Amino acid sequence: RELLPDLWSSLFMVVPTVSTTFASVRTMFGDLPPESIGWLLVDEAGQAVPQAAVGAIMRAKRSIVVGDPLQIPPVVSLPEKLNVEICKFFDIDQSEWSAPAASTQTLADQASRFKSTFVMDVGDREVGLPLLVHRRCQNPMFDVSNSIAYAKQMVHAVGPKRPGSIGSALGRSRWVDINGDAETKWCPDEGEAVVRMLKELAASGITNPDVFIITPFKIVEQNMRRRLDSETNLLRALGVKLDEWCRDRVGTIHTFQGREADTVILLLGAPKASQLRARQWAASPPNIINVAVSRAKQNLY
């Protein structure tokens, strides 16, 4: 065990970077003493519960923590009531130290010597070193994200707009108003609208379209996949394998964190007035809509 730091140092001379997950840190580096690794780079830190990063950060001399607290928050399996009671027992501020309100990224922002402030509509938000230059999305996706999540402080640095073959077939990014009815959050009329859009792509001769179909709700994902199961000829015309394409291209917003596509079809679901709370949940705080919208590079429907 005494030789482990030297063995890892020898490996790092050959392979400068080793990739792992927080869950595997104990297995890979459990016997290393504190501050025995030179640099720790944490990606997607906004999704990590604070305690997950402790072991890795403890073993590093320096850490760079990169993430966005305004995208997908950490997933917490602990019941909310139990979480609240634990925080009360230990006399800690739940919003500051406990997920999902807190993440590895929010604590890194607090610890940073360098800070910046976002002036929000409701209170201000302090972050460490914000990455304000945005290089993925064209408008209107950039404007939506910039307005709802970043207090219009981001800088748009994307090249000329290229709607591509999908944009030419479906037209400009827009809201598709479906006055449908539903017994659950799944609205069959919205699903039919998605199928019609895919048929327009097939009619235009487009194959293997770079499209994500994203929804906030699991039941909508499941029913959209079932609906596409009956469109084998359509998927064949699009030049894709049904099961593989649905698995990779149709899903909830959590499925697409960190990914991007030419075009996103945002399938909202929950169309009835009595389901308004479900849509409000999907839009406030802005994390979920921010992630969905910012997956699209060129077109959003």
What is each stretch, according to the model?
Residues 3-149:
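ASCE P-loop NTPase helicase motor core
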Residues 18, 41, 64-66, 214, ...:
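Structural motif
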Residues 22-27, 215-219, 249-256:
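Conserved helicase motor
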Residues 73, 244-301:
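Conserved RecA-like P-loop NTPase helicase motor core
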Residues 146-232:
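Conserved helicase/translocase motor-coupling segment
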